[in-house]
Amino acid sequence: MSTQLRNNPMKVALASMVGTAIEFFDYYIYAAAAVLVFNTQFFHSDDPLSNDLLSLSTLALAFFARPIGSALFGHFGDKIGRKKTLVASLVLMGGSTVVIGLLPNYAQIGIWAPILLCVCRVGQGIGLGGEWGGAALVATENAPEGKRAWYGTFPQLGAPIGLFVANGTFFLVSYLLGHNALVEWAWRIPFVSSILLVAVGLYVRLTLHESHVFVEAEQKGKKLNAPVSVVFTKHLKPMVIGTFIMVATYSLFYIMTAFAQAYSRTAPKLSEAGYALGLGIPANTFTGLLLISAIVFGIFISISGFYADKIGRRKWLIWVTIAIGVLGLAMPLFLENGTPVSVFAFLVIGMAIMGMTFGPMAALLPELFPTEVRYSGASLAYNLASIIGATIAAMISLKINASFGVMGVGIYLAINALMTFLALLASKETKNVDLTEI
């Protein structure tokens, strides 16, 4: 095999990281806009809570579209290669984000505004569905022996980078132009400016060599005509296990970002059931707190990769999942009648745990599948988990809080942690798996 097919570590890091950075940049600017802007710009109801729920429901649309993207891009990623497929997913994902920044609002085109917003959100979701699996494979299939989880943190580090850049952009726009300008028109700036990240990502990925693991499988004639169907017929068990291993991670991330922001900035009033609907913390204050916690997120992703290579993915994640459950049950201590200080403590602790659970996933999920279905299998597990862990949370977390308080949301997180814990118990350690042999 020619040595030109090997990629240097810096290129692997950038190629895998940039797409995930765009993914989470897209996710968070959309989540922030759904809370701050879309509820008034794209939806027209006399009930503010209804507008909030409709706006956050569009956030959930992408999670439903992700498995479609997983099947589509997974099929081509396992048939024609990781590189070409990653380029296509990046164009769809990034292009949809830019178009959102150009959409007219409800006052300009009426009901077509939320319809077009939903179409773009579905486009984002389909592109996102093919992004992470390919990025994880670029990292792990190019990793040296014994460092697969460490290399797997490259795409995962894109998450705090995207989170930081997205929040930083919103913070600067709001600070420099004011909140009124942000709500009226300046919210478009982060969406349109994402074209710069897409351009960087395309440049790096177009200069990348195909994974040597995929090339070896291709030379051995291991390519399949319908890899997605093979995942469901021959590799259903690892896909189900992988899906539930990822569920708690998604739930935690959604609650740490979208729910925490919506709850923190909502005026401090009571629901009909007598529970607090919010804390009344200014949006810029919360954004500043989240910026700092995003740095903590990144630090603990790197730590998790080191320990997942040292002690194993399964053992590491079992302990971290227990911590997620404990955090869920402790949520009222931080958020009920909370202050900026207690919210900050919640964000820092939660993002540290988030880094520890998210970090090893780019190594673990691909290790569950053989090369000929690895893109499809890892992508499907990752994105099916988003429906259970994030989509449902997006649709019901505010209602749970209104009916049962913060404790209800915390119990929901703990239940998701329990599902992940049981999936980990049902799994096997994959640290020493040879990706060219399975």
UniProtKB/Swiss-Prot annotation:
This is Putative metabolite transport protein HI_0281. Residues 39-52, 107-115, 178-181, 261-286, 337-342, 399-405 are periplasmic. Belongs to the major facilitator superfamily. Sugar transporter (TC 2.A.1.1) family. PROSITE patterns: MFS, SUGAR_TRANSPORT_1. It is found in: Cell inner membrane. SUPFAM superfamilies: MFS general substrate transporter. GO terms for molecular function: transmembrane transporter activity. It is a multi-pass membrane protein. InterPro entries: MFS (IPR011701), MFS_dom (IPR020846), MFS_trans_sf (IPR036259), MHS_symport (IPR004736), Sugar_transporter_CS (IPR005829). It comes from Haemophilus influenzae (strain ATCC 51907 / DSM 11121 / KW20 / Rd). Coiled coil: none annotated. The keyword Membrane applies. Gene3D superfamilies: MFS general substrate transporter like domains. Residues 1-17, 74-85, 137-156, 203-239, 308-314, 364-377, 427-438 are cytoplasmic. Pfam families: MFS_1. It comes from the Bacteria. One of its GO terms (cellular component) is plasma membrane. The chain crosses the membrane at residues 18-38, 53-73, 86-106, 116-136, 157-177, 182-202, 240-260, 287-307, 315-336, 343-363, 378-398, 406-426. The keyword Chloroplast does not apply. Keywords: Cell inner membrane, Cell membrane, Membrane, Transmembrane, Transmembrane helix, Transport.
